[in-house]
Swiss-Prot record:
Name used for this protein in its record: DNA-directed RNA polymerase subunit alpha
Record-linked NCBIfam families: PRK05182.1-2, PRK05182.2-5, rpoA
Protein's organism: Chlorobium luteolum (strain DSM 273 / BCRC 81028 / 2530)
Alphabetical list of CDD domains matching this protein: RNAP_alpha_NTD
Region (Alpha C-terminal domain (alpha-CTD)): 247-328
Amino acid sequence: MIYQMQMPAKIEVDEATHTDQYGRFIAQPLERGYGVTLGNMMRRVLLASLPGTAITGIKVDGVFHEFSSIEGVREDVPEIVLNLKKVRFKSTCKRSCKTTLSIVGPKDFTAGDIVAQEGEFEVLNKDLYIATVNEGSTLNIDVYIGRGRGYTPAEESRPDSMPIGYIAIDAIYTPIRNVKFAVENTRVGQRTDYEKMVLDVETDGSITPDDSISLAGRIINEHVTFFANFSPTEEEFTEEEYKQQDDEFETMRRLLNTKIEDLDLSVRSHNCLRLAEIDTIGDLVSRKEDELLNYKNFGKKSLTELKEQLEKFELKFGMDITRYQMKG
């Protein structure tokens, strides 16, 4: 007989304190020791593994290194860099982009002046102060913005080919401002040695607390699945079965690498996928339905059309395609 471990029926939400940027989540009852185990896992993944958008570098006219001062600007480059690290974005782009700004004085340069040239991102903390440009002066600055996870120091975020005067910035990608958890005792029947784990999550507004813990949970689940599916004994296959398995694997990999434009889709669906930077069938099936519906101009009609196309290949949304080692 397998011992049945005590598990939470559901995750409770503290509705009294819940906002778009803060959430308190309660998991109970848990077996002794699992409060700390789950709390640590969630905290680490939330802080280090969730994707986000950040400024990765700048280029200022007339400036050739990061310790310079800028004529007609009150702040020097190190102060401006420190302020730019605090800018928070909401973005669905996967690739890096650049925006060019020309700030004419007299003016306080704020984060709201950083505008996407093609709508790739939105600044969330628009009132954040960056610098003051004096009367009669102009600050011409290129701002480089990228996607990533957690935190990447400046020396690791430098692109392979940099323009002269490019200044790399420590990129704080994580959309999570703060995470903490506490473990308390809780009662089940007559037993009082079970645990309750309380998880507090604060985000920068680019993702809700609910979505952040859901994404963190999926990341953890994808990793522990390898252990759950582990078998110490290898099945014996005939040479013919091995060949058939290899052929099926290669067929699936080629299918997942098929370009979206090769599908028989409406112009509207093609445009929606292009704007979402979904280039291959593999990119598409790795997304969940609710994730697609969050993209701009992507509606249920487009979703139904895509479902019908995927069903032709016996594919579906939300597939785990990591084993096929997709190439760019």
